[in-house]
């Protein structure tokens, strides 16, 4: 692109697949050329040379065709003027060919003194600072922190006007009393000296007289008269007219007269700050003059005086031992000077703002995009010159509203932290008006899912469990209520507990007698429920059974897993008819009574199912109505008993028979009868033709043939007859 092609190297043929947007321009130019040729070669337009036959008659000034012809003329003149620098010429257009525009790079000499910056406005609409901004527009670098608090150009101009008006007003107020107190002779003589241009001593004498008069007039001001002091305006006026010597002499005369006046009256002269006059150089006020000499605060000792170092002991010529110290080295990194310079230049961003400050754009330097942007400049000969962009800036608009500073935002947040949001108060008001205290308190209770209606009647009630509330522990911090008789203390404690239970807790409970179950909920821990028992039994099956097993509730070792699971999921089947005495002692909770009352309306069909079968004993589970038809305890329909039911009713005493007692009796019968010995036939029948799970097979054999001897025989027979299939199964060996 930077190479300049000679005229001979261009054959004039453009590419055939060029973009069609050039076609419209080519057709327009051909039309203009044809029209100019029809007008004739004799007439010529003003300002157009007659050498070309294509240029003809006069065209109207406001006609766009005339502007096109004028442009062609300028291009032709530019090509002739630039013939020494460039050999490129615009080729005569052919209707069958496309136009070619040469592209060249800018010379290195021109690029040295040129810096090109691109400004991009990040906005959806087109931004034109000349039309969209309020002129004049200012582009400068400045600190953008707290930009909303910085003054705009309009505010600065307004304040400058106010300050200038204030200064003029103050000068007028100062000059008004001074004009009346000035001596006429002094002013006339001063004006004469200035107009006549007399020598410096003459002006000096005049200023001395004026200053002397001013001092004499200032003395009564100390004593309390109303005559104002002389103003130093005369001295400044002399200085403004070029009489500098007069000002210095006037100052000297003022000092001498003031000193004589002070000595004469014996009182110090008080000078106001406004009357002190301007300093020699206001920029150097408060600075200390340095003469280059070193100032020492310590007193100098002459010869014959006491030496301050006389009390210091001599060192004896000893020196401190210095080892071979290694020279400390540090690593230095050479910084790029261009990067350092760029960081210094871009420390403050560019800010473009208009006069009123309504349009403020802040530019950020984009280092990565500077290499991909160029400018194409149109030259006089129709070619383009490519100029690389040095820097690219992206301008973003600043907010037109004032934002909060960090301190103001923290104060706002501190104020809001103690307040409650408005919507929350409204929500609380709706709750208070639409619901009652009973509903609001009941929301805190957690509902527990009910189990099936079939298992509801068989659920054990823990109300018979009584906790010892009178037991005292060593870590109890509660002191006894009354020191005295223990029996009276116990009665008072029980009375207080009853009152607490009978108290109506915010209208949530009905007026009814407290139950023992509620006492457990308030003052003690409830007995482990069915879920807890199920979890405990599941833990006992694991390897940590010794930690969770108890002496009271031991699992029967002769029960199978199916029996244990059935026992966990179901309540005991065999219950007594005559359980009135037990039901009186057991008082169910009101919640359970309510559930039973609701379940009573639900019609349930009587069901009967087999719970377990072991050792020719079948345990049935069913409804109470069906179980009443069977005799109590163990029953064998094949055995005939010559005992009437009436005799059984008179002889037997009703006593509660539980499932655990029946299990214990069966266990005792098993212990009395000797265990059968296992044989190979039993193993073959148990395994069968297919695969068997090893664990289930072992449990089945140990349950059917208990004993250590049968266990050893089982291992020997299994090793002899079976083979392992996988990790968990086995089968009989095929012969």
From Swiss-Prot:
Keywords: DNA-binding, Nucleus, Phosphoprotein, Transcription, Transcription regulation. Residues 453-465, 471-480, 513-522 have a biased composition (Acidic residues). Residues 1-68, 165-263, 297-323, 446-465, 471-606, 631-674 are annotated as: Disordered. It is found in: Nucleus. TFIIF is composed of three different subunits: TFG1/RAP74, TFG2/RAP30 and TAF14. Present with 1920 molecules/cell in log phase SD medium. This is Transcription initiation factor IIF subunit alpha. It comes from Saccharomyces cerevisiae (strain ATCC 204508 / S288c).
């Amino acid at each position: 692109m930077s190479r300049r092609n000679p005229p001979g190297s261009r054959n004039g043929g453009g590419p055939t697949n060029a973009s069609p947007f050039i076609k419209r321009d080519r057709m327009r130019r051909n039309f203009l050329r044809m029209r100019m040729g029809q007008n004739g070669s004799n007439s010529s337009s003003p300002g157009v040379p007659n050498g070309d036959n294509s240029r003809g008659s006069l065209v109207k000034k406001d006609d766009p065709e005339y502007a096109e012809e004028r442009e062609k003329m300028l291009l032709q003149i530019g090509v002739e003027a630039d013939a020494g620098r460039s050999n490129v010429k615009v080729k005569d257009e052919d209707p069958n060919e496309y136009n070619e525009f040469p592209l060249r790079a800018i010379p290195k000499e021109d690029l040295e003194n040129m810096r090109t910056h691109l400004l991009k406005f990040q906005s959806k609409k087109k931004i034109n600072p000349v039309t969209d901004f309020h002129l004049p527009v200012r582009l400068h670098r400045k600190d953008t922190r707290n930009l909303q608090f910085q003054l705009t150009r309009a505010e600065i101009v307004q304040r400058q006007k106010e300050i200038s008006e204030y200064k003029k007003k103050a000068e007028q107020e100062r000059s008004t009393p001074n004009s009346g107190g000035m001596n006429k002779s002094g002013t006339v003589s001063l004006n004469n000296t200035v107009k006549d241009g007399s020598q410096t001593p003459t002006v000096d004498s005049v200023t001395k007289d004026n200053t002397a008069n001013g001092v004499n007039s200032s003395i009564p001001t100390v004593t309390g008269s109303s005559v104002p002091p002389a103003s130093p305006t005369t001295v400044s006026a002399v200085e403004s007219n070029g009489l500098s010597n007069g000002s210095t002499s006037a100052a000297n005369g003022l000092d001498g007269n003031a000193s004589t006046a002070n000595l004469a009256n014996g009182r110090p002269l008080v000078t106001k700050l406004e009357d002190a006059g301007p300093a020699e150089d206001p920029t150097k006020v408060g600075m200390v003059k340095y003469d280059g000499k070193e100032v020492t605060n310590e007193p100098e000792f002459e010869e014959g005086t006491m030496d301050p170092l006389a009390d210091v002991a001599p060192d004896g010529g000893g020196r401190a031992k210095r080892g071979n110290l290694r020279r400390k080295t540090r690593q230095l990194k050479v910084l790029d000077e261009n990067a350092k310079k760029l960081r210094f230049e871009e420390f403050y961003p560019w800010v473009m703002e208009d006069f009123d400050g309504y349009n403020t754009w802040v530019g950020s330097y984009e280092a990565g995009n500077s290499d991909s942007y160029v400018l194409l400049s149109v030259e006089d000969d129709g070619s383009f010159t490519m100029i690389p962009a040095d820097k690219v800036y992206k301008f973003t608009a600043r907010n037109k509203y004032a934002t909060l500073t960090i301190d103001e935002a923290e104060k706002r947040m501190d104020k809001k932290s103690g307040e409650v949001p408005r919507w929350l108060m409204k929500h609380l008001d709706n709750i208070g008006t639409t619901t009652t205290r009973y509903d609001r308190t009941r929301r805190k209770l957690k509902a527990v899912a009910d189990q099936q209606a079939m298992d509801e009647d068989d659920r054990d009630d823990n109300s018979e469990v009584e906790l010892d509330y009178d037991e005292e522990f060593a870590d109890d911090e509660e002191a006894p209520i009354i020191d005295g008789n223990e029996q009276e203390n116990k009665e008072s404690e029980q009375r207080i507990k009853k009152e607490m239970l009978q108290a109506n807790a915010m209208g949530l409970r009905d007026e009814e007698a407290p139950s023992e179950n509620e006492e457990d909920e308030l003052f003690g821990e409830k007995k482990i429920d069915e879920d807890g028992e199920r979890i405990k039994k599941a833990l006992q099956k694991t390897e940590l059974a010794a930690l969770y097993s108890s002496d009271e509730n031991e699992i029967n070792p002769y029960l199978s897993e199916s029996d244990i699971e059935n026992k966990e999921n179901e309540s005991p089947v065999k219950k007594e008819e005559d359980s009135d005495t037990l039901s009186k002692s057991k008082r169910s909770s009101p919640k359970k009574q309510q559930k039973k009352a609701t379940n009573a309306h639900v019609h349930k069909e009587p069901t009967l199912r087999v719970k377990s079968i072991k050792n020719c004993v079948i345990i049935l589970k069913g409804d109470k109505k069906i179980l009443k038809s069977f005799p109590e305890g163990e029953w064998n329909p094949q055995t005939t008993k010559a005992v009437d039911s009436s005799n059984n009713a008179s002889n037997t005493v009703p006593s509660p028979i539980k499932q655990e007692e029946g299990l214990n009796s069966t266990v005792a019968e098993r212990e009395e009868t000797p265990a059968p010995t296992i044989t190979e036939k039993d193993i073959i029948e148990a395994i069968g033709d297919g695969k068997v799970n090893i664990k289930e097979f072992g449990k089945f054999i140990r349950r059917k043939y208990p004993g250590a001897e049968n266990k050893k025989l089982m291992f020997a027979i299994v090793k002899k007859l079976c083979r392992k299939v996988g990790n968990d199964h086995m089968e009989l060996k095929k012969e």
